[in-house]
Amino acid sequence: MSDYQETLYEGYGQRFRMEKMLHEVRTEHQHLVIFQNPRMGRVMALDGVIQTTEADEFIYHEMLTHVPILAHGAAKRVLIIGGGDGGMLREVAKHLTVEHITMVEIDATVVEMCKEFLPNHSSGAFDDSRLNLVIDDGMRFVATTEEKFDVIISDSTDPIGPGEVLFSENFYQACHRCLNEGGILVTQNGTPFMQLSGVQTTAGRMNGLFADWHFYQAAIPTYIGGAMTFAWGATDKSYRKLPLETLRQRFSGSGIVTRYYNPEVHIGAFALPQYVLHAVNKASND
């Protein structure tokens, strides 16, 4: 029995006990490892960085999915960038009012390995008839597609390796171009305590592009460093200020059962701490 040492940060990190190595492969794009941990269940890492675990993935996937879709209220077409483990797809597919889901993943091996070794993440969602799975670079897709979407979810790795381009100015501009009127973009943005410069960079990308931009957060044990931020860009300022009762009605009407998300958490997630507000040059959470 050995340990897996994450290598994301210099001088600070986390270690996972590997009860059993389930799969290890160097794909065309990255080094993929899936192993069994006694506390977190099955764990996937890419290029030395923990990506997802069976124990707490529900927090991340529910918050990146249900917040924008329920805020929008009438999303028919959803685009997922990344998300090869299938967890984001599983949560989007729970919204029966969504008519079309396009998922763009750069690494086909990640999809196939997660189907085999992390089947609970996708829970059969890869067989959903609404899905169009595209194996391609996410940046290239949003830069060239003629399709439009109501919600775009960027479920990227950290801004290193294949995921680096998904934090570029060109990526945010291309996503904005792909949104229908009234569309929403959300992206994974790391833990601000450890990756504050990344949050600042994203704020600079969003400001000027979107009528309303902000961040929201959730605490996910696997992603060390405190609460994780998700970037929010909307073409309609009202989405972030929806009354609690409206969200309750939409959530109840969806019939979706969650383990983390609820309308109260939805609203509270947009309340950022002072150091993050200061970093992104916002005077308040308004």
Curated annotation (Swiss-Prot):
Transmembrane segments: none annotated. Its main location: cytoplasm. Its EC number is 2.5.1.16. SUPFAM superfamilies: S-adenosyl-L-methionine-dependent methyltransferases. Pathway: Amine and polyamine biosynthesis; spermidine biosynthesis; spermidine from putrescine: step 1/1. Spermidine binds at H61, D85, D155, S156, T157, D158. GO terms for biological process: spermidine biosynthetic process. Keywords: Cytoplasm, Polyamine biosynthesis, Spermidine biosynthesis, Transferase. Gene3D superfamilies: Spermidine synthase, tetramerisation domain (2.30.140.10), Vaccinia Virus protein VP39 (3.40.50.150). Residues 1-235 form the PABS domain. One of its GO terms (molecular function) is spermidine synthase activity. It comes from the Bacteria. NCBIfam families: MFS_SpdSyn (NF037959), PRK00811.1 (NF002010), speE (TIGR00417). HAMAP family: Spermidine_synth. Belongs to the spermidine/spermine synthase family. Catalyzes the irreversible transfer of a propylamine group from the amino donor S-adenosylmethioninamine (decarboxy-AdoMet) to putrescine (1,4-diaminobutane) to yield spermidine. This is Polyamine aminopropyltransferase. The lineage of its organism: Bacteria, Pseudomonadati, Pseudomonadota, Gammaproteobacteria, Pseudomonadales.
